[in-house]
A protein has these predicted regions:
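Glycine- and Gly-Pro-enriched alpha-helical subdomains that act as flexible
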Residues: 72-111, 242-342
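Active-site-proximal loop/turn and secondary-structure-junction residues that shape catalytic pockets
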Residues: 70, 125, 237-240, 248, ...
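Gly-rich Lys/Arg/Thr-decorated short loops/hinges at beta-loop-alpha junctions or inter-strand turns
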Residues: 23-35, 109-115, 189-208, 285-307, ...
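Active-site loops and adjacent core secondary-structure elements that bind or stabilize anionic groups
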Residues: 1-199, 214-232
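Substrate-contacting helices/loops that form the catalytic groove of nucleic-acid
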Residues: 175-210, 268-285
Length: 392
């Protein structure tokens, strides 16, 4: 099959629509279930590149959760501790495979954004991973293969309409890629840049120490950014992205957006949140939404009399601003990557509030000295990668 007709393009009025190979070769995919759409395939192919590179860079199984051509989360398959298992809603599942841990992390970092995601997996989808996917609201999954039982689990999702795509892991795209905008053809070389520890050698701060665990987190953040709509920054910790700021025109707005997501990830681990008692039968999405509101500024929307009874068995206490700040002050060792240079030190001021200790960015701003000085003020270690990672 060298082309596949789609229902429509980005929007229902954009017809006809298809994906195809310009050279007449076979498509490197098989649709095993469902009928993926135009945006599904954009998410799938971007996500597949991301997890393929994460696996190559770390040697660990990788997963990503994509929405509208940017990742909501990305991770490698490190084991989950009890707290992370609980906030990712997999504490009832024992001895998860590394791939399942990777997806639990990718989906769980920003559950609000990951709702209705398209999943990419670096390895053959196993039963553990399929069972996590089974109970989440998701549009589809792409992987290099599926265990027979895992495939049956996924095929049963959405009354048999769940999108399952198998991709040829050995497929290598052409070195030149093209696209059209307004009838005009753009052509460029593919971004074949390899992201590894060699990019982290130029440490420009007083603090020169970047431990191996932080190097892995920085690599995860940079590979994630390579497939995130620009401008973008990514906070990472413990083998996963914990806050991704995508598609902002202002660098500091990226840093704030991603920092707020990282804060929410950590606030969900606070005792005040872990102790919430939800009513029986509450939907996962409603539970996620309630937590998101509870840890935010509009907490009374879920604590008001006549409202909390629909969500909680027992009325929770207010999680005060002072309590939240005290909890966030414990977050440390976070890695931060950026797809382009930080123009001002205010980005580092904001990053420090979310526990950032390690930074990787291209450098090249006329105010690099100011950014370095701000990092030194907080004891951060920052590497200049000298590479830009714009993605559009």
């Amino acid at each position: 099959m060298n082309e596949l007709e789609l229902k429509y393009g980005c929007n229902p009025n954009q017809k006809p629509s298809k994906i195809f190979m310009q050279d007449g070769k076979e498509l490197p995919i098989k649709v095993l279930s469902g009928r993926p759409g135009y945006i599904n395939f954009l998410d799938a192919f971007n996500g597949w590149q991301l997890v393929k590179e994460l696996k190559e860079a770390t040697g660990l199984p990788a997963a990503t959760s994509f929405k509208h051509v940017s990742p909501a989360g990305a991770a490698v398959g490190l084991p989950l501790d009890p707290v992370l298992s609980k906030i990712y809603w997999v504490d009832d599942m024992e001895n998860l495979s590394p791939l399942a841990c990777a997806y639990a992390r990718a989906r769980g970092a920003d559950r609000m954004s990951a709702f209705g995601d398209f999943i990419a997996l670096s390895d053959i989808c196993d039963v553990d991973t399929a069972n996590i996917i089974k109970r989440e609201v998701s549009d589809g999954v792409i992987a290099p293969g599926f265990e027979p039982e895992a495939l049956e689990i996924l095929k049963a999702k959405k009354n048999g309409n769940y999108n399952v795509i198998e991709i040829d892991a050995d497929y290598v795209p052409e070195l030149i890629e093209t696209k059209q905008v307004y009838g005009i053809v753009f052509e460029q070389g593919r971004n074949e840049l390899k992201i590894d520890e060699a990019l982290l050698k130029d440490v420009v701060t007083q603090n020169q120490e970047i431990p191996d665990s932080a190097k892995m987190d920085l690599i995860i953040s940079l590979i994630t950014l390579k497939y995130t709509q620009s401008n973008s920054v990514c906070y990472a910790k413990g083998g996963q992205a914990i806050g991704i700021g995508a598609g902002q025109q202002s660098r500091v707005h990226c840093t704030r957006l991603a920092g707020n997501k990282a804060d929410n990830w950590y606030l969900r681990q606070a005792p005040q949140v872990l102790d919430l008692l939800f009513v029986d039968g509450i939907r996962r999405a409603d539970r996620d939404n309630a937590i998101d509101i509870y840890i935010g500024e509009d907490y009374m929307d879920v604590l008001a009399d006549g409202r909390w009874e629909d969500i909680f068995k027992v009325k929770p206490p207010v999680f005060s601003l002072e309590e939240k700040r005290a909890w966030l002050n414990q977050l440390s060792g976070v890695a931060l990557g950026s797809d382009a240079f930080f123009p001002f030190g205010d980005n580092m001021d904001r990053a420090f509030k979310s526990g950032v200790k390690y930074v990787a960015q291209p450098g090249g701003s006329v105010r690099d000295d100011q950014v370095i000085e701000t990092c030194d003020k907080y004891g951060m270690a920052m590497a200049f990668t000298n590479i830009r990672l714009f993605h559009h």
